[in-house]
Curated annotation (Swiss-Prot):
Transmembrane segments: none
Annotated binding of acetyl-CoA 2, by residue: V238, G239, V240, Q245, G246, T247, G248, L249, G250, K251
Protein family per UniProt: Belongs to the acetyltransferase family. MshD subfamily.
Entry function: Catalyzes the transfer of acetyl from acetyl-CoA to desacetylmycothiol (Cys-GlcN-Ins) to form mycothiol.
InterPro entries listed in its UniProt record: Acyl_CoA_acyltransferase, GNAT_dom, MshD_Acetyltransferase, Mycothiol_AcTrfase
Protein's recorded name: Mycothiol acetyltransferase
Positions annotated to bind 1D-myo-inositol 2-(L-cysteinylamino)-2-deoxy-alpha-D-glucopyranoside: E36, E186, K227, E234, Y273
Keyword terms: Acyltransferase, Repeat, Transferase
Stretches assigned to coiled coil: none
Encoding gene per record: mshD
SUPFAM superfamilies xrefs: Acyl-CoA N-acyltransferases (Nat) (SSF55729)
Amino acid sequence: MTLEAVPSPLPPATAVAVTELARLAAQSDGVNPLSEQTLLHVDSEHHGDLHVLAYDGEPGTLDVSGLQTAENLIGYAALGPDGSAELVVTPAARRQGTGTALLRMLLDHGKDRLRLWAHGRLPGADELAAHFDLTVARELYFLRRPSAPLPEPGWPEGIDVRAFVPGQDDDAWLEVNARAFATHPEQGAWTTEDLGDRLHQPWFDPEGFFLAVDSKTGALAGFHWTKVEGDEGEVYVVGVDPSYQGTGLGKALTLHGLHHLQEVRGLPAVTLYVDGTNTAARALYEKLGFTTAALDVQYAPATV
């Protein structure tokens, strides 16, 4: 086995190989091993990202353009500038030390700041984390709700709802998103580039990106961004500006988006992710019929 640590961007052929590796692992495990953010960064240049590639033997051969084909790629790990990390090993190469080697290299590059995500919390993830004395530092719940009757949203007085307009609402949305998620290490740090990445994805639909606007001031008060891929919809992100929190706007926005996914898009189920510390949001979602389908955990060194 050969390990190779490279900064962004990955060669296109290698990025394709990483995406295919993640697909094979997801097919085997029933859960995606890499987050949307990581997969978006695989084939784009984000300064500070480190990619660790594990090959069966030497790195892949070169194609006609001089880029590695990565045909023998058996493992991959990503380390972001904030210390957030993920790794995946192809199913056929597990229990052979590949995951251990990948994690050891991640620790060599950022032990003091490492935060390793394990999606679905599979048994192998707990074993690997324990081997390096990593403990659970954070939990992220994956919830699902089958199609069922919903209450109507009760809007606070003076709130209008409209669709997001790309190129017009970008800056205002980024500002409110940052304020709404000031204590959230990933969502609150979104940049113009992060937003642009999503706006150019095949799944993006502005008609499913709802903005709540103050009818008197025109200020953006909150939003509900929905996402549809396949036959499931997702409460992608709901945010409320702190000055409008406590008014019931968050619940109204949530219901508005759920009605859209269920009745306008006709989807049989809706999913969402919620941080384990956000007990208020979890309680709201449970009252609306969501139940836990999976659990993601983040491991960190015990001293962090």
